[in-house]
A protein has these predicted regions:
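C-terminal amphipathic alpha-helix
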Residues: 12, 18-47, 51-54, 58-61, ...
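A short glycine-/small-residue-rich loop at the edge of a beta-strand within enzyme catalytic domains
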Residues: 82, 86, 107, 114
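Mid-chain, structured segments of secreted extracytoplasmic proteins
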Residues: 62-99
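Ser/Thr/Gly/Pro-rich low-complexity, disordered linker/stalk segments of secreted
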Residues: 1-15
Length: 190
């Protein structure tokens, strides 16, 4: 039997119709979250350097947010999605405020920073209410780790420590894969 291009499977999976739902969801979730940190990274660099393309990068970040939200919309009712959309857009708005604060003052620790973490708590709480398989404490830690790494990258970049910035970004990729897999497992358990 020959395998058609693009239809290879990993060990333990099949190509039977309906059996790839988990694999497809996992791939989409991973790509969406990896794209999230990559697009935010490029946007922040363009913001810090005042590059002409920063609005294009910002638009891409918001388009990616729609992609992430669309994944959850397959599992959550419309009323829940309205709340999740509001929380996620607040996350992006606060990321902007934190970046602006750090750009103006490397020692920035203002209300936006505190609200950024509060928003992460709210997202973790919301998701764990919608998907009982999610452990809220574990999810909150993953979101905190994401914000910690995002902040550390911004600080390293603004300090001109590009090696550390890159190292943290590469670690953040693993964090996003773990987050995506955690989110996928919970959705599949619904």
């Amino acid at each position: 039997t020959t395998t058609q291009p693009g239809t290879a499977t990993r060990p333990g999976t099949t190509t039977q119709p309906g059996n790839n739902m988990g694999v497809d969801l996992r791939q989409r979730m991973r790509m969406a979250w990896l794209n999230h940190i990559t697009l935010v990274k490029f946007y922040l660099i363009s913001f810090f350097e005042n590059l002409s393309g920063q609005n294009a990068w910002k638009d891409a970040v918001y388009k990616n947010a729609e992609e992430i939200l669309a994944i959850f919309a397959q599992y959550y009712p419309a009323s829940a999605m309205q709340r999740f959309c509001k929380l996620f857009m607040e996350h992006l708005r606060l990321t902007d405020e934190v970046a602006a604060g750090l750009k103006a003052d490397p020692a920035f620790s203002g209300a936006a920073m505190e609200n950024w973490y509060i928003n992460a708590e709210e997202i973790a709480s919301f998701l764990s209410r919608q998907t009982p398989a999610y452990n809220e404490t574990e999810l909150r830690k993953m979101f905190y780790d994401h914000l910690d790494m995002e902040r550390q990258q911004m600080e390293a970049y603004l300090d001109g420590d590009y090696v550390t910035d890159i190292e943290i970004y590469l670690r953040s990729q693993q964090n996003m894969i773990e987050l995506a897999d955690f989110l996928t497992s919970g959705l599949l358990a619904r």
